[in-house]
Amino acid sequence: MTRHTPNRRARTWLGAGALLTTGALALTACGSGFNDTPGEGHASGGGTLRLLIGSSGDAETKAVTDAVAAWSEQSGVQAEVQTANDLPQQLSQGFAAGSPPDLFYLAPEALAGYAANGSIAAYGDDLANKDDFYPSLVDNFTVDGKFYCAPKDFSTLALIINTDLWSAAGLTDADVPTTWDQLASVAQKLTTDGRVGLAFGAEYQRIGAFMAEAGGGLVTDGKATADSSANVEALNYVKTHLNDGTFAFASDVGAGWGGEAFGTQKAAMVIEGNWITGAMSADYPGVKYQVAELPAGPGGKGTLQFTNCWGMAADSGNQDQARSLVEYLTSTDQQLAFSKAFGPMPSIQSAADAWSAANPDLTAFLSGAENAQFPPNMAGAADVITDFNAQLESLKTGDPQALLQTAQSNLEAITK
């Protein structure tokens, strides 16, 4: 996850965009990368280890910076952290200038492109803890049989319920929805003047959960399946309840994202990920809530899962030190510390029991991993999803089948 600010790109890609902040370590100047003179530099070697992260907010920045500082003191290797204000752009500029960071947050949808041009090192199989990562996360960062990079954490979507509003509507624990029909029913009971029953972002990264619950998805076994009947059913379900006023996009209730709609109580329920916990404690501490698994649809249970990895520059002269740092940052103790600080779930199986014990009210997020889909991660997928999101904004009045057929054509162009 993670405290997510009302920056849509940051919310959508779990840290791909970020606030520019200053941490405990010396942060390099922000701009086109790490080298002020484009073309002169190369990935550092034998000197300071450099990291570029896309942070969800101050809590994440401080946690990562402090962890890197602790490793630096322990290892004797200097390291510095830069927090990007536009991670994809700054990372691309760093590579173009010949001065990429040694380590950086890397989203799944960016992996294939960097792997294809040889920009990143495939170091996953060299990690001492490689067998501890969840297999589905390893798959997400594997290209052509090579495990490229260590998943740093992961998050899933769940149903977040305002418990005071729930009780006020006469609902009990027995009414927590487990089917689409039940979800529609409780959303109707929770909808009042000035408040919608259920809100979520007008984007695939939220609405895609309904597609998964219908038995659909954008890509199946490497083939584009956006225009499947299951996906049409999912979008029609969402459209129906957008029009009857019991569901709403966060933007339609004047909120920048689902967490804001929920925190300001413009929505009694939202579909969001782990990162909402940080926002609630920081910005809306008086709002009581519970987390439940998303209701099953015609295809059964389903949700979406998100992650980033620690990418490593192929030209880094500090690969041994960088790999050592990654092992430290993905260790059980450190991942549990990150989870406590800013909300994500550990990417390693050995931390699951401790995480569940420490977060008994959030276990629905972890349970969702059993039925979770990842957004497509092949080269070009990010652009396709951006276009799909633009069309989903008009779902309330649009033709679901037509929207999906456009997405199908775009996906076919990158999956052939």
Question: Predicted regions: what is each one?
Answer:
Residues 76, 142-206, 217-252, 314-320, ...:
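Helix-loop-helix "hinge/cap" segment bordering the ligand-binding cleft or interdomain interface
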Residues 1-50, 73, 412-416:
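Short, low-complexity disordered leader/linker segments with a strong preference
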